[in-house]
Amino acid sequence: MLIPSKLSRPVRLDHTVVRERLLAKLSGANNFRLALVTSPAGYGKTTLVSQWAAGKNELGWYSLDEGDNQQERFASYLIAAIQQATGGHCSTSEAMAQKRQYASLTSLFAQLFIELAQWHRPLYLVIDDYHLITNPVIHDAMRFFLRHQPENFTLVVLSRNLPQLGIANLRVRDQLLEIGSQQLAFNHQEAKQFFDRRLSSPIEASESSRMCDDVAGWATALQLIALSARQNHTSAHHSARRLAGINASHLSDYLVDEVLDNVDVSTRHFLLKSAILRSMNDALIVRVTGEENGQMRLEEIERQGLFLQRMDDTGEWFSYHPLFGSFLRQRCQWELAAELPEIHRAAAESWMEQGFPSEAIHHALAAGDAQMLRDILLNHAWGLFNHSELALLEESLKALPWESLLENPRLVLLQAWLMQSQHRYSEVNTLLARAEQEIKGVMDGTLHAEFNALRAQVAINDGNPEEAERLAKLALDELPLAWFYSRIVATSVHGEVLHCKGDLSQSLSLMQQTEQMARHHDVWHYALWSLIQQSEIQFAQGFLQAAWETQERAFQLIKEQHLEQLPMHEFLVRIRAQLLWAWARLDEAEASARSGIAVLSTFQPQQQLQCLTLLVQCSLARGDLDNARSQLNRLENLLGNGRYHCDWISNADKVRVIYWQLTGDKKSAANWLRHTPKPAFANNHFLQGQWRNIARAQILLGEFEPAEIVLEELNENARSLRLMSDLNRNLLLLNQLYWQSGRKNDAQRVLLDALQLANRTGFISHFVIEGEAMAQQLRQLIQLNTLPEMEQHRAQRILREINQHHRHKFAHFDEGFVERLLNHPDVPELIRTSPLTQREWQVLGLIYSGYSNEQIAGELAVAATTIKTHIRNLYQKLGVAHRQDAVQHAQQLLKMMGYGV
């Protein structure tokens, strides 16, 4: 819940001096990316900019405090301020910020700029007190913000120092409007206006000018002069002499003498107590100070000129001038040290009543009240956890004694989930084991089940499926139905384990249950995870169209719940890329893989390994070996600098072995084969994949017998477990083994099986990747004219892809080949006497490649009637009457020229 006052413009007071000369300068702010107002405390930065902002509707205001160094808090308020300025135009960014569903601040800002691209009017965002930001991540994000913000957007930053925002670069490019302390200092005319409005008796212009010079135009000093003169009934000049040469670091003594010591005891205590509040309203004041009418007291303090300012138009929220507030808090620690814990406790209670648990935690921590902190956490910690207030929770839990956690084991569970979210898996188990050992009395069975659900998640994340399954089952046996979150976790883990074990049907059922529960209880990250798992299972079963439709539902969920920045989004676009690759939609597959890399741009490079593998696959399917080699260099570097799941290693090894196959690199394949451990089982898609890599390397090395043993066992497992996509891949590799070992009948048999199974999977690229050996076999099958219609159509499609991306046959009928052919001593006399035109040679090559007339017309970009004319002419010149005769004639010519066909 956001505090309204932090998003409200300070109210312009009637007695303030209108800084016309500075407002004139600010009037051109829309011509700059950044308007920067810097000066020490008390020079009127906020007052000036609030004057300039008056009347501007499309302007957001964000007042910072120390707590805004938390990235999530900063993001929530910044987006909320822009939403105020745009009237709710950026709803997707707002939802992502509220739900903490973004990978980083920069990725959130990137989404924001996408939405702002449709906003065409000038837009302003004011960030006040930026000097309070010390988090380098926020500085980096704001530099990104400034580089990429729309042209019609101006950022206005108020700070006591020069912020780390790439100021020099903006200045060089004339994109920076600057106002500093020298310009902010009051001139003589402004000082005269100020005193005329503040003092009951007017003073001479020369006198006000002298006082202005004495304090170097410092607005706070001028305000103190006027306040002191009113309180002490002394001359303003006397106060000016005392303030001459003073600066903020020496202001404390003056404020004690001239402000605190000149108010009554009741007002003094009010000032000191209320100063612990970063912002305040009537209810907070009543509870913290004991005053009966907080609003009336605040307005009275405001009238006395005691540095209190309104934070919103309704006058409900107030705050002290930062300089005065800091002074008061320091004095409060000295003068009211004994009462201070109780004051903070009162503030925490009031914040809780108003629904701001994070502010309440701030005061409970300041009070050192472990019991109050514990009570707040017991009631609100899980809500804060689900809103990613992780840093605040970690600080709070560290402040509680271990005994308090043991007395409230759900807080131990919370601490363990915090560790799990930070991938500190070993610490999770250590913490839970210690808690179970030290908790007094018999541990509640439900809590024990929640511990087991978390342990199960840790185990599966850490690559221990057996332990994960045991713990998940224990948790599900003991958890009541109402304990939905832990039941979702345990059900998801159990489903994932069954996926690993190859029990696809049961795994799919559990993942569908997980999705239903997660959607019902708005646990969106588990809903997304379950959909991704369902899609992977359907892919493994060979139901690629069903997998596609499940992915569509997942993309819709991401859009509806604004989950674009979750790392899981990368998982989804990656499996979409795998599916697109299988269907030979290579451009789309590559784009999807690159979008996955973009999602992970703020993570370690190792996280991009899977998407990089897909980019290599796309290059290999296109026959672009140079590009594949370049990408493989990067992939192999990542492999050597990280620890990966066996699925990741299997996919990376796959593209390496295929590359070695296409380039004939037996040395690399042999070296890899020597050092690669053989999996113990082959009961899931990633273990099948690694065994297939081993068999492919063995085939490349001519080790046909062991490769055949591997592939036959893989097929047996795949059939038993209904791993139909793996069976399709295995058949294609077995086909290559038979083809290369001269067992042409066996090769044709398994190729027919693979084509038939591809009617279910839709595979294209898995055939294409085998290159010319596959093309030769498909041509022969097409020439036999015995394939069923669907298989015939697929075979022709695969041939087109091979011809497009690999060393295709009609390339042999180029000008150089034809010249060598005509000079060959065994060339048929008919071809010498009636030579084909270059276009006719191209048409012959395409006929041999299995193209239909329509496909040839499309390939050569000519009309179908023109192709018929070319075919009639070349038939006549070759002395043939039928298409099959032309294919056989082309085959004879290729054999004569030394090409294996």
UniProtKB/Swiss-Prot annotation:
Residues 853-872 bind DNA. One of its GO terms (molecular function) is DNA binding. Gene3D superfamilies: Tetratricopeptide repeat domain (1.25.40.10), Winged helix-like DNA-binding domain superfamily/Winged helix DNA-binding domain (1.10.10.10). SUPFAM superfamilies: C-terminal effector domain of the bipartite response regulators, P-loop containing nucleoside triphosphate hydrolases, TPR-like. Activated by ATP and maltotriose, which are both required for DNA binding. Residues 829-894 form the HTH luxR-type domain. One of its GO terms (biological process) is positive regulation of carbohydrate metabolic process. It holds the Pfam family TPR_MalT. It comes from the Bacteria. ATP binds at S39, P40, A41, G42, Y43, G44, K45, T46. Keywords: Activator, ATP-binding, Carbohydrate metabolism, DNA-binding, Nucleotide-binding, Transcription, Transcription regulation. NCBIfam families: PRK04841.1 (NF003420). Monomer in solution. Oligomerizes to an active state in the presence of the positive effectors ATP and maltotriose. Belongs to the MalT family. Positively regulates the transcription of the maltose regulon whose gene products are responsible for uptake and catabolism of malto-oligosaccharides. Specifically binds to the promoter region of its target genes, recognizing a short DNA motif called the MalT box. This is HTH-type transcriptional regulator MalT. It comes from Salmonella heidelberg (strain SL476).
